[in-house]
Amino acid sequence: MNGLDDENQIDERDHYTDDGDYEIDIDSMNMFKSLYYEMMAYFSDLQMHLGEHLMAIDWDMKCKSIAEPVGNCLTALFYIIRLLQDTLLSNYKDVYVSTEAFDLSKSTTLQEFPFLIRFVEVSKTKNLQNAKYIKKKTFMFYFDKLLLFLMILILSTNAYISWTFIWRNFKTYSLLYVVDRPNSKNVTKCSRTDLDQSYMENVSYGSYWTMLSYYIRNFRKKDDLEDEITTVKQKTPNVNEKDYYYQLKKWSPSKFLTSLFCSFSPTCLVFLILSDVSFTTSIAVILHQFIFKYVVFEGYESRINDESIIHSAMISEINQKFVEPRLSKKVQDAKIDATPEGKVYRTEFFPSLTNCKSNLFNRHDLKGRSITESYNDRIKEFEIVTNTNNETHNVIKVVKK
């Protein structure tokens, strides 16, 4: 005993100083800190590596190999769960329901009459059988809870996918050089100077809830609201003088998410929840899956691809007919000696630096005066341009009726 006490005293001396203060092992603390930092760095590096790997995958190319099979499997699993709930578990609940509320053996009124004793005996036998079935219902009870848990999990997954597909996939484009407002409800008017400024024009194109919330927030600013309404009606003819621009919020879900949403549609799940599922219900589910796939991918997605092909063909036609002929003109600068000395006129050609040439030509007469001429394509001759130094005036003549 004395030896053990001495060892404990030695251990206590190792942790306490001569002044009675507790001594901390610095090496062990540094080891734990380094281990903690290494673990945190490992998890952060692992998260970064997984994020980069997922971002590098082209998910649109995997819509048929991953998204569509996963969505169909989840829909089929939900159908099987609802089928088991409406066929197997519904009969189980009806047969093995507790009958203690209808226990006639506990009635004192029936026991007073001899001719009613047989009903009491029948009730006792049923209660005994029910008690035996309660012991055997453990597996079916937990199986019911498991199906309910899977059903809630699938519904939560579908709600998250639907929310992401409908409200989380938007791209914003700033239309800086558009003068008139485009005819779209996704276009909003934004200020170039004040980011918090809102326009009445955006509210008029919004929903009723947007209008109501705007009027509630600006209830005390009626004067500013009226001034804003008057400024909205005025259109600025010059684009550079505008203090606002239009912003387009385009809904653009990815092809992978669209395929997952169509194969795992919330309408199919709601239909299975609200209806009595049987084996014939599978026909409606299969038709729903095929119709959604045909309408969205075979119809609408193909239409978008065909429109992009038509637009690219139109752009190619414009480039070949108008843009390339103007940009690929082979032109040269020419200098002609038009002096009357001698009968031989000298002409020099120089490489052109630009493809854009002016129709005005400057020459000098015999007295050294500068003359400006323009080539008239109609008569195929040069004409002298007069009054070239005068300022131009934009005059609009209105004929009175």
Swiss-Prot record:
GO terms for biological process: maintenance of rDNA; regulation of exit from mitosis. InterPro entries: Nur1/Mug154. Disulfide bonds: none annotated. Keywords: Membrane, Nucleus, Transmembrane, Transmembrane helix. It is found in: Nucleus membrane. The keyword Membrane applies. GO terms for cellular component: nuclear membrane. Pfam families: DUF2418. The chain crosses the membrane at residues 146-166, 256-274. It comes from the Eukaryota. Coiled coil: none annotated. Member of a perinuclear network that controls recombination at multiple loci to maintain genome stability. Required for rDNA repeat stability. Belongs to the NUR1 family. PANTHER family: NUCLEAR RIM PROTEIN 1. This is Nuclear rim protein 1. It comes from Vanderwaltozyma polyspora (strain ATCC 22028 / DSM 70294 / BCRC 21397 / CBS 2163 / NBRC 10782 / NRRL Y-8283 / UCD 57-17) (Kluyveromyces polysporus). The gene is NUR1.
